[in-house]
Amino acid sequence: MEPEFDHFQSQMDSDNTHQSTMFNVQDNNAILMSGMENVLQSPRQLQAAAQAQQQAAAQAQQQQVQAQQVQAQQAQQQQQQQQNQQQQQQQQNQQNQQQQQNQQQQSQQMTQQQLQQLMPPPPTSDTSNFNDNISYFVYGSQFTVPRRYSIVKCIGHGAYGVVCSAKDNLTGEKVAIKKISKAFDNLKDTKRTLREIHLLRHFKHENLISIKDILKPNSKEQFEDVYIVSELMDTDLHQIITSPQPLSDDHCQYFVYQMLRGLKHIHSANVLHRDLKPSNLLINEDCLLKICDLGLARVEDATHQGFMTEYVATRWYRAPEVILSWNKYTKAIDIWSVGCIFAELLGRKPLFQGKDYIHQITLIIETIGSPSEEDICNIANEQARQFIRNMGNQPKVNFANMFPKANPDAIDLLERMLYFDPSKRLTVEEALAHPYFQSLHDPSDEPICLHKFSLNFEAWDLNRDLLKELIYNEMLAYHPEDPQAPYYTDLNNPNFNLSRIQSSSELFNLLQQQKQQIHQQVNQQSIKN
């Protein structure tokens, strides 16, 4: 019976297990059903969440749009402010410009009114008041001229003085008037003034500036400022070279030809200019060229000491023999200067822009090549000779490559002007006869000076009073109506022998003797009449 019991019990246990399993399944189903209920509820929640997200996104987008609108409004306001500021600035600038224009117009009107008040137009027939003086103030300096001249404007000022353009009411010509203030305070400058006046008064040439008048002071005692009246030119060669104005080969040819034509007249009088440079070559709008500023000029055969050592020529246009202190230099120094100016016309910049003496001679040798040993031996300074030897053998630069657009004849002429050895350079007559000037050269229209100059006073230690006397003497030549005009003595007259003069006092006495003799001759002639 036991087994059965056991079997039954086993069956019971099995049933119980099955029942227990059934209960477990039911529990799981209940859990599952509970989870399903949760799952069935999530779409509503998700929909609500989605709506919330959409609302949040819409709000964020709206806020972003509003922020962008605010930024756009701010940017527009800033732009408007900038435009307003620009308009205000433009208006302010316009107002400032208008004020400046008004001030300039007022200034011009005031100047014109002052000129009209100071100098009314002179009558066309009555010139009785032409000798009455009238004063202007130009750059702080009193500018006193006769009413014969109507001042137009200031055209230059510097250490040398003031230059004004003016109209000569007697002739109708336009002139330039240069005032040399305190002309007798510096003896070196006074001597330069005397030299230039004396030379220009005698030179009469189309390509040399001419002195038309030296204004007469009220008295010799009041003679402190020198006023020189000359031709009025439009510009100078330096201004033309540095301008954008195109320069053709015809321009270069005509300018250099006129330089040489004027220089021929100077050299024929045995005078060296010694300071040729573009700013000393005056030009008119019709391309007429005139050489000016002979203040550094010298007579070639001068025997006085110091002739070779005195400062001469602007460095860029200075010949090698001047820089290196050769024992003697000649008219060839002016040909060198013309060559430098010619190259500047071709290249529109200076050929040798040396910063000092050493740099200048270095540039020259690097361009035209090393000099020969014979040329080096002509240099007086041993250190200069050694410096050039230490440079070694420098080859010559090809000017045709330097100036590729230049006329071949122009290149040939330039090379012949810029030899290191002055004796190998062309003379002014040879340069004028060069093929480059074939269409211009006419020996019959290239006049020379008919008499030689001999400026013996260069050797004397002239004092202030004697220099003043000599310049006053030169002034009298322009005023034959002056009672003292008969006392005028031409220092270059062969009859006025200066060779025996040894001192300034002897010269002064000789001048007085000459004047007394002239005065006696005038009186005798008056008695006969």
UniProtKB/Swiss-Prot annotation:
Known catalytic reactions: L-seryl-[protein] + ATP = O-phospho-L-seryl-[protein] + ADP + H(+); L-threonyl-[protein] + ATP = O-phospho-L-threonyl-[protein] + ADP + H(+)
Annotated positions of the Phosphotyrosine modification: 311
Biological process according to GO: aggregation involved in sorocarp development; asexual reproduction; cell division; chemotaxis to cAMP; defense response to bacterium; ERK1 and ERK2 cascade; G protein-coupled chemorepellent receptor signaling pathway; G protein-coupled receptor signaling pathway
Keyword line: ATP-binding, Cell cycle, Cell division, Kinase, Mitosis, Nucleotide-binding, Phosphoprotein, Serine/threonine-protein kinase, Transferase
Chain positions with Phosphothreonine modification: 309
Domain notes for this protein: The TXY motif contains the threonine and tyrosine residues whose phosphorylation activates the MAP kinases.
Listed name of the protein: Extracellular signal-regulated kinase 1
